[in-house]
Amino acid sequence: AFTGGQIAKWMYTHHVKQIDEMTNISKNNRAKLAEAYTIGCNEAIDAQHSKDGTIKYLFPTHDGKFVETVYIPENDRATLCVSCQVGCKMNCLFCQTGNQGFEGNLTATDILNQVYSLPEVDKLTNIVFMGQGEPMDNLDNILRTTEILTADYGWAWSPKRITVSSVG
């Protein structure tokens, strides 16, 4: 038999991309899982590299829209700015996202995909909710995401490594 804890550990600790990589689950149970589920990793469809090492990725969402995610490497840290909405309702003067209009909230799965599918995932030291969208306008999915990022069954990150940036 297998447990949710085993599956979560493979996904969030070992970052497997295929169910077959979960080697402490029997082949029979892996086959059953693979028939019913996929891990759901959506690779970035575009990446723009800057001279300072920053990389802006374009990730697809579950409903065929796209969001930007920015990876920022520094000397002793690597930060990921994740999006929580497609577009934004706030229309802040300093931000171009509001000019796109608002198309919807990202699910926790869409937000986590930006982390999980990042080629540099093993280098990350910090995550900032400061991409497209206003986190407080999508609070339920922000809370689900931060729970998985900080829970023992998830990524087990310290909450100090996660920042939620808000206009309000």
Task: Give the location of each predicted region.
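Flexible, acidic/Gly-rich N-terminal and inter-domain linker regions that tether
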Residues: 1-78
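Conserved Radical SAM active-site core
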Residues: 67-168
